[in-house]
UniProtKB/Swiss-Prot annotation:
The gene is COX4I1. Component of the cytochrome c oxidase (complex IV, CIV), a multisubunit enzyme composed of 14 subunits. The complex is composed of a catalytic core of 3 subunits MT-CO1, MT-CO2 and MT-CO3, encoded in the mitochondrial DNA, and 11 supernumerary subunits COX4I, COX5A, COX5B, COX6A, COX6B, COX6C, COX7A, COX7B, COX7C, COX8 and NDUFA4, which are encoded in the nuclear genome. It holds the Pfam family COX4. The modification Phosphoserine is found at residues 31, 33. It is a single-pass membrane protein. Its main location: mitochondrion. The modification N6-acetyllysine is found at residues 4, 35, 42. This is Cytochrome c oxidase subunit 4 isoform 1, mitochondrial. Pathway: Energy metabolism; oxidative phosphorylation.
Amino acid sequence: SVVKSEDYARPSYVDRRDYPLPDVAHVRHLSASQKALKEKEKASWSSLSMDEKVE
């Protein structure tokens, strides 16, 4: 059988309680709505709705 090796060029994500906000994104492949929200986040956050801020 073939063993798939990790891509060590990308930082690995480890969920740790002592370091709660790592630099690595939790989702590698964003949906269309998530991408739209990311673009909207680049502008002023005061324009975001409460639901968008929680998302």
